[in-house]
Structures are given as structure tokens and as C-alpha cells.
From Swiss-Prot:
PTM sites of type Phosphothreonine: 535
One GO cellular component term noted in the UniProt record for this chain: cytosol
Phosphoserine modification, residue list: 1249
Gene: washc2
Keyword field contains Phosphoprotein: yes
Region (Disordered): 1-25, 188-210, 240-564, 576-1383, 1419-1479
Entry's transmembrane regions: none
Protein name according to UniProt: WASH complex subunit 2
Amino acid sequence: MPEEQPQQQQQPVREQPSNPDDVPWKKVWTINEMRDSAKDWNLSSDAGLLNYMQDFANKLIYKTKELEFQVDELVKDSKSIHVKVHNTFDQFLMLSNTQFIENRVYEDNSELNNEQNEQTDKPQQQEITEEILIPKFSKAILIGLEALEKANFVNAALEISEQSNSNNNNNDYQQQMNGSIAASSAEGGLVEGGEQAGTDAQPSANTEKKKEKLDHYLRYPLPHIIGSQQFHQDDFCGLFIEDSDSDSSDEEDEEDVDAEDGSDESSSESSSDDDDEKDEQQQSTLFLTDEQPKQQNFFFQDEDATSENNANKKVSESLFEDEDDIFGDKPVASKKSSNSYTSSLSDILGGDDEDDLFGGSKKKQQQQEDADGDEPTKKKDPFADELNNTLSSKNKGGDDDLFGGSSSTTTTSKPKKKSMFDDDLFGDSEETPAPKSSASRKVTFDDSLFGDDETALPTSKKDSTTTSSQPQQKKTLNDLFTDEDLTPATKKETKKSSSLSFLDGMDEDDLFGTPKPKSTTTSAAPTATTTKPPTPIPDSDASGSESTTGKSSPAPKKPVGGVKLFDFDAAGGDIFSGKKVGTGGKSSPSPAPKTESKASEDDFFSSDKKSTSATKKDAEIFGSEGGLLDVPEKKIKRHDPKKYVDSDVLGIDSISSDKNKPKVQDPFGVGAAGSNDDDSFDIPKANSKKEQETKPTKSTTTDDDLDIPKAPTTATTTTTTKPAVKKSTKSNFFDFEDTDSPLSSNKKSGGDDDLFSFDSSKTTTETKKQPITEEPKKKQDTTTTPSIDPFSGLDIKKPSEASISPASPVSTIESDPLFGDIKKPVAQKPKKTNFFDGDLTKDEPAKSEPTKVEPTKVEPTKAEPTKVEPAKVEPTKVESDKKESNPLGGGDEESVFGDFSIKKNPTTSSSTTATENKPAVKKSTKSNFFDFEDTDSPLSSNKKNDDDIFSSTTKKSTTTTTTTTSSKDFFGDLDTSSGNKKVEEKKSSDFDSFFSGSDDPLGITKPKSKTTTTPPLTSTTANIESDDPLSLGLPTFTNNNNNNNAKPPPPPSPLGEDVPSPLTSNNTKNRTKSIGSMFEAQQQLQQQQQEKNRSESPTSEKAEPTKKTSNISSLQNKLSLNPNMFLPGSKMPKKKKEESENEDDSSTNNDNDSSATDLSDSGRSSPSVTSPTLSGGRPRRNTVSSRNNNDSEESEPVKELTHATASRPKSGGRRPPTRKSGTSAPNRSESPTPTQKSDSESEKVRSSSPITTKPVVSEPTKKTISNTSFFDDIPSEKTSSGKSSPSPTIKSTSEKVTIDPLGDIFASTTTKPTASETKAALSSAPKKSEPETPKETPKETPKEKEQTKEKEQPKETPKTTTTKKSTKAVETKSETDSFFDDIPDIISRPKASVKSAAAKKASSTTKPVISDDIFDDITSTTSKSTTTTTTTTTTKAKSTKAVDNLFDDDTNTTTKATPTKATPSKSKPKAKNVENLFD
């Protein structure tokens, strides 16, 4: 029925919804309805029953699902907690790794703990006693009386059964006990030992003999259970037995033997009672073991169930002999148990006291009970042994008694215990308790309770503090309140009782015995309290008046016991637990309640009172008597102080927050920059970014190390030294270039994002760290803060993005190869460093930056990578990008660039050719062609925009006036007006700034960048043409240059051979020679010059840069100071000057290299080849062809890059365009003719090429690794696709056909100038052309703004616009288009118009059709001249135009700010072309 009713209730609810028509068979019937219709059952009833069953099943399923859901929630919560717990573990482990954590094993000095507990307890107890003791005593007495009433029945039965046996045994035993113990304690001893004495009196000799036989084994308790508290507390794990331990174990063993003997001898006392008691003991032991936490249950159950074994015997003895013993002994037992709970320390003290109450009686009783309690004691012995061991381990002097050992009196009581035990347990001391047991049982509750209560109280006090045996209950009472009485007899008994209570006491006081294990386990410290607890028992046991009087006599001591009593008695066992409360409460109040309940077996009082008062003790002792708890808590803290808590709280919070950062910085920073990078990545990237920005100095070295390991391992060491410089520079440059470029490139330019995202992903931290180092060097060289500031502002925001960007590495296929090759990077980075320093810097800002920071150092490092590159040149064959770029940069970065720059310089004019050849050499020396343009364009597109943008923009602006004239004019103006020195300086500064701020670094940097970067260029270019989406730009660009898109991939290995066939026009021939020489010669030179550069490179390369752009670079340096200030850092100007000198030297070196040998590879040999082919154009073409290992167009980009490297000031802004911008920039700087002065000036203004170049130079390493990433980044700038972002130069290429290889990028830039090519490029890559529009209104509004501003500024002054716009472009780093926007604006500069004629002439000579195509694309963007379209493939003259156009387009694409007034009209049409190309 009850089931039916709830169902009925639920059913009506379902009836309503289920009764649409109130049809009986459609509604869910209730049970009542079914019951009513049972008589008239029909189909409708069946239907209703079915509905009811279905409804019931649905409800059941619903509830089941709800329950399942709840279970799932619980599982989820539990799993989350599990995770949290393990996270906490991990935090601790991490803390332990970072912070020393000491794990100590503390030995609790029971005596000290007891003394402290007593000291603390006495004043507190005195304060508390008057107010609290009276109610507690009254409660304890009431509970005790109830327990006594229950015990009286059991005791009466036990007395009746045992009187016959126990009387004789007790008499004999009393005599023995009297001999050993004082007469006053004789009754107590009889009470305690009565039963045991009865059993042991006669067979004591047998028991002793048996014990002696068994002593060897009994002496050795089983070791502690592994993992148990005792196991941890005991240094010897219970294996080593000290004297006290052995004694206690012997006593326990004797008790066990006595239990065995007792089982045999129990018939003498009363076999029936013993059997009953055995059953009771087993039950009580079950209660103890199972219900130890339940104190009241133990007391009542044990007492009810018993008189249980020991409780019946001991309690009966104590109750019968001395009801004081009942009160005294039981309270002592309760105290003992409570003490054991309260503390393992209290086990020692309380063990003695309680053992006195229980212990003496227990041991004696247990010996008698051994027959009864053999099995239970044996069962409990393991626990008892462990408890004894723990107590003994605590006392390592180890009193035999568990309690005695820990009690302050244990030391004295130990020998006494031994004598007691020797007499009782071992000797015949058990027999002495026997008379006591008989007497105690005979001494009925009435006498012992009230008559002997006073005596019992003092005895219990004595027992508790002195651990005196129960036999002298008066002493125990005194001991309760005072620890003074240390009667040896009582002590001996107490020790016995303690050991018995633990071992045999487990049987009697399973509550008591097991509590002791708990007490020992629960707290070692509380043992001190155990001594005191016994005293309260007599108090409570004594009638209210007597107990108070008994306590009053020890009143001064009683306050201590009283307080303890009250503390424990708070629950109700106050009298018994009085001192226990004090001591036990202090030691461990919570354990005390448990022990009290167990102790209450012996003391019915204590069992009830303690059960209640034990809980109250916890509350009151802890609450009201805070002192008691305070002491145990303090003791617990001694154990627990666990430096974990403080260290955890401090360590986890502070270490996790503070230490993680500092340690991450210090450990990782100290640990090799690599760890910092790892930390940066491991640490939340936001944190790592911030830290890295702050840390960049540390992380720069680590980034360099990381990047270098990723790239050439050799470079890593040098880069690590360099990072110091890089740090400061990177902060600006890095924020500006690397941080911004990775971030902004990721944000701004899709393609740049790929490059930069690759870098940022890879070296987001690295970019932050390393680029910063690069910037300082660049700053040192250029000392232009303006560029840094605009970018640093952007960079700071972007650094976080940069850290986020690590995901972007996937964005560009090229970048992926870079990072996929990061393991390979050793070869690739050098390659890309050669091909693009910008990409390397971005991909691996650290590496490229290392080169920048200290070119000299970086160059040796790169020189080693260059060696790797020669090896990689073959891999590059496997990977067209890497292989081809290796040949270009592989032979010698210097030579590769030198060749390119030499070609461009010759292109400019015959007179300019000499000067420009030097710049070209300079470029080749630096491998800045790749480093400069590629590194500059990808990296500087955002970060090094000023250098790349400006260098490329200047070139673009050159083309703006007239394609044909602008190329020559562009270079001629820079070279003639400004002098070739400025152009050379600008180029050298570009290289230097690209690689590092100092000339010496340039020397080193150049070899590295050249060796590492040039090979990547060629290989990357070839691969890009065939493989990369960027190749789209090249294919269209290949329309003129690139019939060879298929061929360019093969050319990489035979660059020279394949390229000629790819090239349809003169470019092919020039390229063929240059490319062949490039790859073959460069590979050789890379090996040779890498060695040379390692030894000589610092000086030779330094000299080479100066020669490269000595005249042009001087003008460019002057012009480019402002833009460089904005982009890489203020250090760039220094590099310009240094580079100008170095470039002069390097130009001579390049000339020597190119003329003397093809060591410069195609790049340097190409100048010689180029000059014969064309005054200025062939060398460029050769350089381009050398670049175009895969593509004839690539060779042109190579030229452009070479020139860009030479005139890095120009290409500083162009770095995002990378190859294209680099290519156009080199053409401008190398073709520099009289017109080149103005161009170089405008270029300098547009892009402080030295400044930007330096950042670019440092970047090459990373970009070398990520050739594809460079182009991907640039195309992505121009268009969301990685192709369009290539940056200004790349802009046109990516516009037409997202240039697959780097060469294609340049080719597309070349095509871009040409109207027809622009159209083709638009058709091939319409998406890129539109993105290219970023100049005017590309993807990003900031770019548009920059474009508009730049366009306006170009009209006013090309130079200023260049710097301003370049900074703006840098500021708009977040958008890839900004780089291109800056570049198109640069294209429209009047500079370009001035230089266009000379630059085109130079480019026609230096750069054949391919370079023309590249420049044509650029020209079309800056100043659309349809001539360049045709010139791309038609003739050398046209190729010069194309070269000019390339530079113009590069300039336009490179920097928005660079375009001058002349460009605005042209830049807009070219911007359209750029848009088309990028679309």
C-alpha cells in the first residue's frame, strides 16, 4: 500500500495529461481505481493497467536518467577534482624542481611534549577548573554511575564465576603484588590484576617459562605496515627493538603468552567466565576495531557486552576492589584511550596513566583474560605491536609500555614497568595482580566506587601522570593531578597495562587498546597528555563529593587534570578525561574522544562521559580551553609544519607567479637562450610575449640560440653572443620589425603573416627577443629611433600576437618548410638568410638578427650555415626553394649579392657601374640581396618596412618618372649626384643595418647572410616559382621572363645552365652565366668563403659593403636616415657610415671576387658577365639569373635583391616584399647613375635603408629558412593569400601570380610595371593585384591612410615622405598590406622619377629582360609605363626599364610613405596595377 499511494499520487498527475477524452482506457489508472474496478474488470481496466504500467516504467526510466545525469555530474566533478589534485601535485613537483624542499623525519620527544602539555595545561586548567569542572564532573559522575550500574551486573556475574578461582589466586597474587608494590597500591594492583593474577598465580612459573621460551620471538613484533603512520614515525619501521621497545614488546608478548596461559589457566579463575569473556572480548574487540571512533558505543557496548573480557576483569577488579579503581582505573583507561586518540605522545604518558588504570589491571586482567583474550589479543597484537613500536620509536629510549614510553614518567616507570612486568608479565608480576584482581572483584563496586573512591582518585592521578599502575589508585589520582607520584610498582603496572592495553589491552580495552594505536597514529605529541588523563577518572569515578574531594586534595595538580578532565569531559567524561582533556586535548583533542570511548570500556564512566565529554573536549578543550588545543596544534604543527604549507602557499603562489616568471627567465635565460624560447612558448604566450618584450635581452640570446639551433647550429653560438646587442636594438627593431612584422605581418599581411606568423609562431618569443637585439644594433648603426618608435608602439601590441602567431607558421608553405626545416634550419636558415634575411629574421628573427646585431659574428655563424647550405644546396635540389637559394647564397652570400649588386651597379652606367659594381659586390658579400630584400621585405615589410620599403620604394620612385630613364636616372641620380659612395653606403648600410649595426658585424654578417641567404634565394625562388602559390605572380611575370616556370625548378641545381633556356630574352643568357656561376661558384665560394669569412669575412665583407654602395650609399645614408630612424632603430645611421666604408671595401672585394673568380657565385661572377653583356643591365640580369636558379625571373629578383642589399637604406622599408623589393632596391642602388643621387636621397628619406637594411640583415637568417614564408608573407600582405603579401617588390609579382618562387615574386614585380604584364598578372593573380592596392586602399585602412599620407607626402618631398610613410607603414605593421602600401607609395616618389632613367639604363645593362620585368611590374605600380611590359623580355634597354620598373614597383610596394610627389600620379595607376597584381 505505501508503494501504491505514492504511485496513485503520481498517477493522477499523469491522468490529466493522459485523459484527453476522459476515456477510461486512455487514462492512466491509479491503484485505487484498479482496486475499485477489480470486481468489474474489463478491457478498459486492462488498458488502464497497461497505461499505469507504462507510466510507472516511464517514471522509473525518467528518474533513472535523472540519476544517471547526476552520476555523470558527479563523475565530472570528481574528474575535475582529480585534475585539480594532480595539478596541485604538479605544482608541488614544479616547486620542488625550482625550490629546495626539505623532507624531515621528526622524532617526537614524548617527555618534552608531555612537559609542555602539562605546563600549558596547568595554567589553563586552573583558569577553567572552577567554572567548567563542576558541570563536567557532575556529567562525568552521572555517566560513570550509569556505566557502573551496567558494569555491576557484569562484574557480579564475573565475581560469582571467578570468586572460587580468583580468591585463591588473588590471595597468592596479592602477596606477590604486596611484595612488589606498596600496600596502598596492593588493592589497586589486586583490582587490576585480580583476574590475571587468578590465572597467573598458580601457573606463573609455567607462564614465565613459556614466555622465556617465546621471548626471542615475542620480543620482535612484526614490522609496521608499510605506509602506516607508525611506519613513517618509526625510523626503524618496527624492525629495531630498543630496550624499552623490547621490554614493552616482551610485556606485550608476555601478556599474549599470559593470554595463552590464561586460556589454559582461565579455568582456575572461571573457565565459563573466561569463555564468556572471550566471546565478549571478541565482541568488544570488534567494537573497538570497528567502532573505535564511536566512543560512547564502545564504552556502553564494551561494558554492556562485557565486563567484556578485560573490561569485566579489570573493571570488575577495579570496580570490585576499589570503586575508586572503577572510577580511577576506568577514568584512567578512558584517559588512556582518549590520550591515545588525542596524541601518540599522550599514548606514552596516558599509556602509563591509563595503563596504570587499565594497564595494570589490563595486563593482570589480560593475563587472566589471556585465555579469554588470547585470540582477540593476538588479533589485536599487530596493532598493539605497531602502537608499542610507535610509542617505543617515539621514546626510542622506548618505554616498554606504549603509554609509559611516551609519558614524562615513562623513563622512570619503564624500569618499574619492567620490574612490574618482569614480576607481573615476565616474572610473576602477573601473579601479584592476581590477588588484586580477586580483591578488586571482591572489593565490590560499592566499596571501590565510593569508599575507595578518594583513594582511587589519588591513585588514578598518580597513575596518569606517573603512569603509576592502577593497583595504587590513590597514586593514580595524585598522578592525574600531579605527575609527581612515580611509584615503581604502579609505574610497572602502568607499563604493563599500557603494553597490555595495546597488545593484550586490545582484548580488555579493545576500545582502549585500539584507541592507543589510534592515539599513537593520531598524534605522537599527545602522548604527554595520556599521563594526566588517568587522574580525571578517579575524580569522576569518586562520588561527586568524593571525586571532588579527592581532586581537591590534589587540587593544585588537579587544575591541570581538572582542566584536562573538563576538556575531555566536555563531552561528558570530564572526570575521567580531566587530565586527558588537558593533555590529551592539547596533544590532539580529536583523537582524545576516540580513546576516551575505548578507555571507557574499563571505565563505564569514562566510556559514557568520555564519549560525550570527548566530543565536548574537542569543542570545549579546543574551544573553551584553547590552550589545550593550541598545544596539540602546535605539536601537530611541529609534525605538520610541513614546509609544504608555507612553501606551498608561498611557493605555489609566489613561485607559480613570481618564481615561474623569474625562474623561467633566470633558469631558462641562464639555461641557454633556447630554454627562454621554450619558456616563452611553454609559458602562456601572452606572458611569454610580455616577458620576452621585457626580457628580450635575455630571450634574444636564447632566441638566437634557439633560432640558430633551428637554423645553422654553428650560427647559434655566435648569435648568442650577439643577442646582447640585439636585445636593445630588438626592443625597438624587434618590436618594430620582428615583433611587429611577425605580429603585424600576421595581422596585416596574409603573406607576411605566413612569413611572420611563421616567425612569430616559431619565434614569436624569438622575434620579440631576437628582433629586439637586431634593432639595437641597427639602432646603433642608424641611431634612428623614429622608425622604432612607431613600430615599437605597434610592436608592443603585436608581441602578444606574435606569441599567438606561432600557429601561423603553417600559413605559408614557405614558412612551413622553414619551420618544418627548423630541424633542418641549419641549412635552410643560412639559405634563406642568403635569400632573404628578412624572412629569416622573421622566420627566425634570432638568427637573422644575430647577423644583424654583430654582422661579423653572425657572418661566421652564417658562414657555417653557408657550409650547411652547400650541403643543403643538394637538399635544395630536393626542395627547389632551398636548393636554388643555396646556390645563390650558397657559394657566398657576399659573392651572390656582390654579383647581383655588381650587375646592378654596372647597369646604372659605365661610370656608375664601377661604383655600383662595388655596391653590388657589397650586396653579394652581405648576401644582403636576399637578406636585404627578402629579409628586409618580409621582415621589414612590417618591421623593417623602412629599409625594405624605402629601398624598394626609392627604386620604385626611380621608375616613376620614366621607366627607361628612371632606371638609369634612379641609379644615376643616386650615384652621380650623391656619388656612388652614398649608393654604396646605402647598400652597405642596408646590408649592415640588415645584418647588424656595426661594420664589423656586417663583415661577419655579410658572409653569413651571403652564404646563408643567397642560396636560399635561388632555391627558394626556383621552388616558389614551381611550388608556391607565390609562383602565381612569377608565372605571369614569367610571361616575359618566365617561359621557364617548369624549367626554373631544374635550373636550381644547374642554375646557370637551365636559366638561359628559361630566359626568352637577353636575361636568359645573362642569367645562364650568372646562375651557373651563382650556384656552382657560390656553392664553392660558400664553402671557400665560409671558411674565409669565418677568418676574413668580418673585414672583407665590411670592406665589400662600402665598395658596393660607396657613392650611392652615402647619398642613401643621408637620405635614409629618417626612415631608418623609424623602422629598425636609431642605430642604423651608424651602420650606414660604417657600411659605406665597409661597402667600399666589400664592393672592391666583390669586384675582385666577381672578376677574379665566380667565387661570388653567379652573383659575383655575374657582374663580370653582366658588364660584358650589358654596360649595366647584363650584370643585373646575371645577378638576377643567378637568383633565378629556378627562374630567369628569379635571377632578376636576385639582382634586385642584390642591389637592394647594396642600397639597403632603400629596401629597408621593403623588407616585407623581400625578394622583389630587394631586387628592385638593388637595381636602383646598383644602376645608380647621376639620377641615382636624388633617387638615393629620396630612397633614404623614403626608407632609411641602412636602418631598415640592418634589421633586414639580421632577419635574413630566418627568412633564409623561410623563403616561401617570405613570399607567402608578402603575398598575404597584398592579398589574403600568402602570395600577394610579398611586399612592394613582391607586390607586383604576387599581384600577377602569387609568385611561387622568390624569383617569381621578383618576376611578377617586374611584370607589374608593364601594362601588359600587369594585366597578365592581374589575370593570373587578380586577387593579389587588388590586395596590392593596399597602397591606395589595400586590405587595411591604416595602410590606406598611410598610402594617402604617403602619396601626399611624396608630392611634397620624396625623402621626408619616405621616412614618414615608412614609419607609418611600420606602424601599420599589423596589416601586411601596409608594407605593400608603403612600397607602392615609394614607387611614386619623384626619386623614382629621377632615378628611373639612369636606373633603367643600369638595369638594362645589369638586369636583362627578367630584371626589367620585375622592375616593369614595380614601374607599372609606381608609374605605369607600358614600355616596361614589353621591355621585360624584349631588349636590354627595355630590361633596364624593367629594372627601373622593378625598383619602382618594389619601392611602391615596399613603403607607402616613400612615394614622393612625382609618384602620386603614377603611383595611383601603379597602385591599380598593384591592386590587380595582388588581386
